[in-house]
Amino acid sequence: MFDIGVNLTSSQFAKDRPAVVERARAAGVTGLLITGTDLQESRAASELAQQHANFCWSTAGVHPHHASSWDERVAEQICELAARPRVAAIGECGLDFNRNFSTPEQQEAAFSAQLALAAELSMPVFLHCRDAHARFAALLAPWLDKLPAAVVHCFTGTAEELESCLSLGLSVGITGWVCDERRGLELRALLPQIPADRLLLETDAPYLLPRDLLPKPTSRRNEPCFLPHIVRQVAAWRQEDPEWLGQKIDENARRLFRLE
């Protein structure tokens, strides 16, 4: 089972990153994709991936929260990072109109530029969309025939938005959000609609600790070692065998990100 979304560069992991990786291995996780969210974090993610060869890969990109930092210099350096052997996708990029830490105009410019970069480099894209689906889809659609693959990470949208993502040919990343009895029930009901070959699972650690973990962890910090719990829960809600699903999401991740 492959975790396609781990924020391993987070300061929350500063004291025990090697142990976090080893706990994931011990839990049966077969690989991690470390998320890059700005130039500095993308560089750090790449370096971590190189330290854990054959288990970790990374993305390189600028999250919509940081879109105001996007300029020609950043674009050039993201392009250079993308050439590193363990960088598997451009991103995390997209739109987030929930908080607008960068203006919508800045977000759209950075998103479009990163889609163009991914198309130029023939790399998959690791996508973010929150409260912005119409513009997200409109900006993304013209690029899809030029991109090898795309996954919308941490999907928490509506039935209509899921249908739109699937019609665009996107793969869908599901996190422990779906384990939340307060806000994950709508998403849980949508799980059977996602084709098995388009489903990816992720922890988004250290965020989104599954609320139904038993016994409850003493810390609220999420870790990739909890991915097997998400796999078991999603398998139950999709009425699939958890071992089969774990293998399937590993195959999906390795195919989508073209991992050796």
Swiss-Prot record:
GO cellular component: cytoplasm
Compartments it resides in: Cytoplasm
Pfam families recorded: TatD_DNase
Alphabetical UniProt keywords: Cytoplasm, Exonuclease, Hydrolase, Magnesium, Metal-binding, Nuclease
Keyword Magnesium: yes
Domain of life: Bacteria
Cofactor section: Mg(2+)
Enzyme Commission designation: 3.1.11.-, 3.1.13.-
GO molecular function: 3'-5'-RNA exonuclease activity; magnesium ion binding; single-stranded DNA 3'-5' DNA exonuclease activity
SUPFAM superfamilies, sorted: Metallo-dependent hydrolases
Residues holding a divalent metal cation: E92, H128, H153
Family named by the database record: Belongs to the metallo-dependent hydrolases superfamily. TatD-type hydrolase family. TatD subfamily.
Assembly with partners or alone: Monomer.
General function of this protein: 3'-5' exonuclease that prefers single-stranded DNA and RNA. May play a role in the H(2)O(2)-induced DNA damage repair.
Name the UniProt record assigns to this protein: 3'-5' ssDNA/RNA exonuclease TatD
Species of provenance: Serratia proteamaculans (strain 568)
Gene: tatD
